[in-house]
């Protein structure tokens, strides 16, 4: 999934179908999140797969290890390319998630598994006040990244602002999947740690997730091509 990942932040398959139709059969990397998956169920994944798109299923599992393991066995059977959990669920939970994917994968190759460190909507002040974390935001992200690697996962979800430090700590093969990407002309909305595609590339992101800059654009194809151009600059 080296192409920019488009966040399909829609509620219905009809909206998804109309959006994807604009790309004239091009094979894309897309993210199916909670809104779309919970509104339509697993069938939405199969419909998108039939169009030859790579899928990041973004459900951010966070529960006791046995529950997450069982859930991942089921998700693995969907044939998606990448899934995620919350790193704050702990090392045992993340290990259980990986084991579930390995059991459930029918192709012999499990989906990539990454863990959310801190949401890009979270500021350092929010984290320290609401989560009672005394460390800095960067220290928290690096701690979760190290825990994720110890659990045998493939990488993390992080903001681009922490990506280079994670790369130095955990190696270049450890994925740094970055949401909160906007074209320079777009509003940041509810996300705080936000950068442009070109900036994300220059400071260490391995993959980027782009939603509103593409899906809400007057010309989504042109916006996607601009993101792609900046990402590959």
Swiss-Prot record:
Pathway: Pyrimidine metabolism; UMP biosynthesis via de novo pathway; UMP from orotate: step 2/2. GO terms for biological process: 'de novo' pyrimidine nucleobase biosynthetic process; 'de novo' UMP biosynthetic process. One of its GO terms (cellular component) is cytosol. Coiled coil: none annotated. Its EC number is 4.1.1.23. It catalyses: orotidine 5'-phosphate + H(+) = UMP + CO2. GO terms for molecular function: orotidine-5'-phosphate decarboxylase activity. Signal peptide: none annotated. Substrate binds at residues 9, 31, 58-67, 120, 182, 191, 211-212. InterPro entries: Aldolase_TIM, OMPdecase, OMPdecase_AS, OMPdecase_bac, OMPdeCOase_dom, RibuloseP-bd_barrel. Keywords: Decarboxylase, Lyase, Pyrimidine biosynthesis. The keyword Disulfide bond does not apply. Homodimer. Catalyzes the decarboxylation of orotidine 5'-monophosphate (OMP) to uridine 5'-monophosphate (UMP). This is Orotidine 5'-phosphate decarboxylase. It comes from Listeria innocua serovar 6a (strain ATCC BAA-680 / CLIP 11262). The lineage of its organism: Bacteria, Bacillati, Bacillota, Bacilli, Bacillales. The gene is pyrF.
């Amino acid at each position: 999934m080296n192409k920019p990942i488009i966040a399909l932040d829609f509620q219905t398959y009809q909206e998804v179908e109309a959006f994807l139709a604009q790309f004239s059969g091009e094979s894309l990397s897309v993210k199916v999140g909670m809104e779309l998956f919970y509104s339509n169920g697993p069938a939405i994944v199969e419909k998108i797969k039939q169009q030859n798109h790579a899928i990041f299923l973004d459900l951010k599992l966070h529960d006791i290890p046995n529950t997450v393991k069982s859930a991942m066995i089921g998700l693995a059977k969907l044939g998606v390319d990448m899934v995620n959990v919350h790193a704050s669920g702990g090392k045992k939970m993340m290990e259980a998630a990986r084991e579930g994917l390995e059991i459930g994968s029918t192709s012999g190759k499990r989906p990539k598994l990454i863990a959310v460190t801190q949401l890009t909507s979270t500021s350092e002040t929010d984290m320290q006040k609401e989560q009672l974390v005394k460390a800095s935001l960067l220290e928290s992200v690096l701690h979760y990244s190290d825990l994720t690697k110890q659990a045998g996962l493939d990488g993390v979800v992080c903001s681009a602002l922490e990506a280079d430090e994670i790369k130095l700590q955990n190696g270049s093969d450890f994925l740094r999947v970055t949401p909160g990407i906007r074209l320079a002309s777009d509003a940041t909305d509810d996300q705080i740690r936000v950068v442009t595609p070109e900036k994300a590339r220059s400071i260490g992101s391995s993959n980027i997730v782009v939603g509103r800059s593409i899906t809400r654009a007057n010309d989504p194809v042109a916006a996607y091509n601009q993101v792609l151009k900046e990402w590959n600059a």
